[in-house]
Amino acid sequence: MIFLATLPLFWIMISASRGGHWGAWMPSTISAFEGTCVSIPCRFDFPDELRPAVVHGVWYFNSPYPKNYPPVVFKSRTQVVHESFQGRSRLLGDLGLRNCTLLLSTLSPELGGKYYFRGDLGGYNQYTFSEHSVLDIVNTPNIVVPPEVVAGTEVEVSCMVPDNCPELRPELSWLGHEGLGEPTVLGRLREDEGTWVQVSLLHFVPTREANGHRLGCQAAFPNTTLQFEGYASLDVKYPPVIVEMNSSVEAIEGSHVSLLCGADSNPPPLLTWMRDGMVLREAVAKSLYLDLEEVTPGEDGVYACLAENAYGQDNRTVELSVMYAPWKPTVNGTVVAVEGETVSILCSTQSNPDPILTIFKEKQILATVIYESQLQLELPAVTPEDDGEYWCVAENQYGQRATAFNLSVEFAPIILLESHCAAARDTVQCLCVVKSNPEPSVAFELPSRNVTVNETEREFVYSERSGLLLTSILTIRGQAQAPPRVICTSRNLYGTQSLELPFQGAHRLMWAKIGPVGAVVAFAILIAIVCYITQTRRKKNVTESSSFSGGDNPHVLYSPEFRISGAPDKYESEKQRLGSERRLLGLRGESPELDLSYSHSDLGKRPTKDSYTLTEELAEYAEIRVK
């Protein structure tokens, strides 16, 4: 047997230390399973000058002093022992050979304790050795797990049981190792200070799933019912793995957002929430929330969760998308252009999701784009009709914002067709309506009189600017002859245009001039008729008083086409306008009535096809009197 084969080694060690003095050698501690036996190896020595004929010995329990009457475990002289050890103790060694090995059988827990040996050589040659052995009665195998078990690294777990009973030898097996991959088992017998230990070694590579796994070892004794089991839980260390995290998150501006990060690791990880390299929150925990109150578009972006411990780290990201209405659009580009130039205007905004962008002018859609943050408006060759106010509108499901901008188109003067002259008796009034940008200069030329009057001569010309329209009015008084030719000339830095102004109501002027002559002729004819009637009716005394008065000039016929966009009361405006024109054309002490049949235009920035409206705020005019 292995036990007997290795026992001489213990004796060799003891023999080498013999020095001819009182002394004993035995293991300081020894273990055995309950219900089995234990052999306590023992060797003693005494001085060489003592030559006893017979050597006796006594084993005591828990005390080395006889006067304390300790329980006698074994006594070679009388075989009288304490009742607890009756039938349980036996001396295996030969005291004559200084071998005091003791065998205890049918172990029970109360037998655990200290065992002392006393040598009896006869007479006064008795000696109780201070050396003793402590017996430990066990009932579970001892499973030894390394202090650090790391996932992915091979580990060795040992199961150790005492093997100090020569009559019963344990057999070891592992329990619960099926979930540990493909483990290998090795067995060996190990001697430790005179005691023997049966060892089973289990080799395996643990995983993170093995953390907390309950691993068992069983010691069974053949041909008996004795079985002893021991268990140990594996504490497997492994790096963090993030197992719980929000997917992409969408939130409306101003709402509350809670981001969760959960990780599995041993030991627990340090969890850190970060954004753009900045730490927002951290804690040693299995899960960590990041709460964002009333989120803004500035908090839109990618958030990272970092989990780390001494064995590694893991990280994941989540994208937070903050949904919000478009910001007020910004407009970059040309705001002033020359007629014929190409104009490029960029309207941009920011929103989530991207908006629908539209550019309007007078409720007409000029350009639009869907789900884009920028819109480019291209006008390849601008005209005066492109001048005006534009709107860039951005909208999505969360709101709408708009920005107005103006495009100013600069162009050469255009004298509108409603420009004309009107005459009544000795007064001529000329109206020149010019559309231009920038504001032009206006001059009236009378070729027959070799006279040129411009708008700076306020006593003759009145001018008023409204939007792109410039209205200049020239008043000529004392014109008794045929109406003069009047040429209106307008110029700015882009060009010059001239137009001979047509006359309206020229036939009325003619009748006004021949009116006195016609009255004289009519009077002569009337006298002749009266004389004839008098001669034929001599008996009739008829006194006729005939008077003829030329009367006032006939009323001037006004035929305006009054078109003012957005006017609340068209007819009231017409009456005010007529009164204003009468004041403008009024003679000294008279109210001349002229035929002014010209269109009225909206003084705002309207297309040229709209008519011109003369407002009642015009002042009194100076007169040019022609002798």
Swiss-Prot record:
Segments on the Cytoplasmic side according to the record's topology features: 537-627
Intracellular or extracellular location(s): Cell membrane; Membrane raft
Effect listed in the UniProt record for changing T128A: Abolishes ganglioside binding
Chain positions covered by the region annotation Required for normal axon myelination in the central nervous system: 578-627
GO CC list: membrane raft; mesaxon; myelin sheath; myelin sheath adaxonal region; paranode region of axon; plasma membrane; Schmidt-Lanterman incisure
All copies of domain Ig-like C2-type, residue ranges: 139-237, 241-325, 327-412, 413-508
PTM (free text): N-glycosylated. Phosphorylated on tyrosine residues.
SUPFAM superfamilies with a match to the protein in the record: Immunoglobulin
Mutagenesis or variant effect for W25Q: Abolishes C-linked mannosylation
Binding residues for a ganglioside GT1b (d18:1(4E)): Y65, P66, K67, R118, Y124, N125, Q126, Y127, T128
Functional summary from the UniProt entry: Adhesion molecule that mediates interactions between myelinating cells and neurons by binding to neuronal sialic acid-containing gangliosides and to the glycoproteins RTN4R and RTN4RL2. Not required for initial myelination, but seems to play a role in the maintenance of normal axon myelination. Protects motoneurons against apoptosis, also after injury; protection against apoptosis is probably mediated via interaction with neuronal RTN4R and RTN4RL2. Required to prevent degeneration of myelinated axons in adults; this probably depends on binding to gangliosides on the axon cell membrane.
Listed name of the protein: Myelin-associated glycoprotein
Origin species: Mus musculus (Mouse)
Gene: Mag
